[in-house]
A protein has these predicted regions:
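Phosphate-handling active-site elements
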Residues: 25-32
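Short, glycine-rich nucleotide/cofactor-binding loops
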Residues: 5-13
Length: 144
């Protein structure tokens, strides 16, 4: 029952949504699943309510967001940490937010199964992140 980490950005939101809905709604997984989604500003975030609903329905699912360039009109309230219920999300590139707020505190990151989908630069950074934290290549999967 390895924990599962999803990291998405940009157009990667759609395939991630499909995969996560199948995992929870169809397969009824009991694995611990965390989804981190990044965009430049709030305008680039989609399906937010869908993921928040999944989070309410399944206690083994956590959803986090990050903006790399939050705009004033976003009124983005920065989370202090992953337990902060009042903040909207984090600020920075999504892979850095995952490292700082999740992987650096994970007791066994090498046991994680990692799925990711997003723009090419993000994909490259997330793949390197997984390797840097000792996640075996067979547990790192790019979704297209």
């Amino acid at each position: 029952k390895q924990p599962v980490l999803y990291v998405g950005g940009g157009a990667g939101m759609a395939p991630m949504r499909s995969h996560l809905y199948h995992l929870f709604k169809t397969l009824k997984t009991d694995r611990k699943v965390t989804y981190w989604y990044g965009g430049r500003s709030k305008r680039e975030l989609f399906y937010i309510e869908h993921f928040k609903e999944l989070e309410r329905e399944f206690p083994n699912f956590k959803f986090y967001m990050a903006l790399s360039e939050p705009q004033e009109e976003d009124n983005w309230k920065v989370k202090k940490d992953i337990n902060d219920e009042e903040g909207d999300g984090f600020v920075g590139f999504i892979h850095n937010c995952v490292i700082d707020n999740y992987l650096n505190h994970h007791e066994a990151p090498e046991d994680i199964e990692l799925y990711f989908c997003g723009p090419p630069l993000m994909n490259k950074a997330v793949e390197k992140m997984g390797q840097d934290f000792g996640i075996p290549d067979e547990n790192i999967r790019f979704m297209s």
